[in-house]
């Protein structure tokens, strides 16, 4: 019985890896499956990050770490745990959404944000390793870029308008669309 494996034997048991909505629609549906046709088949369940409140990329752009109530409830997690299945949750701390409270604080407070170091300043990261372009970002030299994998075409830069009106490039692998706040149009104020 996999679910009754000793703690030191757990690494030898099968682990289910799934998005909470990938097997039926919700984590509750997965719990139903684990209680019935897959009973005792898994010793652990690695739940991919769309279990949290996210806005892009199947959960890899976290707004906050509350459970996404459309997909999961604390009761769903408890049902799975009660089966003797260890839960592994992917917190992906390095994938904050532009809607996250931390990024919103950066937009509001700029360099004074207590979260400014949560985000990678593109130019600070590449300082001394490329050329400043007219667009205000450093273009890394080919010797660095050819060793890297980028998920999407182009450089993963998000230009962010700071409170003082300047724009700053940040490294952003997932969201390439962001609308900087702009001054109110006098016609709509």
Residue positions per predicted region:
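Acidic/aromatic-lined carbohydrate-recognition and catalytic surfaces
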Residues: 2-180, 184
């Amino acid at each position: 019985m996999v679910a009754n494996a000793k703690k030191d034997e757990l690494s030898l048991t099968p682990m289910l890896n799934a998005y909470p909505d990938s097997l039926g629609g919700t984590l509750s549906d997965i719990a139903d499956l684990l209680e019935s046709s897959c009973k005792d088949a898994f010793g652990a369940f690695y739940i991919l990050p769309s279990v949290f409140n996210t806005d892009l990329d199947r959960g890899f752009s976290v707004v906050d770490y509350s459970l996404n109530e459309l997909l999961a409830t604390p009761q769903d997690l408890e049902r799975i745990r009660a089966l003797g299945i260890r839960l592994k949750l992917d917190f992906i701390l390095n994938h904050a959404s532009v809607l996250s409270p931390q990024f919103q604080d950066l937009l509001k407070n700029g360099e004074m944000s207590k979260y400014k170091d949560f985000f990678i300043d593109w130019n600070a990261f590449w300082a001394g390793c490329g050329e400043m372009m007219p667009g205000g970002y450093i273009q890394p030299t080919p010797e660095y870029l050819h060793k890297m994998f980028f998920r999407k075409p182009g450089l993963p830069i998000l230009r962010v308008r700071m409170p003082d009106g300047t724009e700053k490039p940040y490294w952003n692998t997932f969201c390439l669309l962001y609308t900087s706040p702009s001054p109110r149009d006098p016609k709509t104020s």
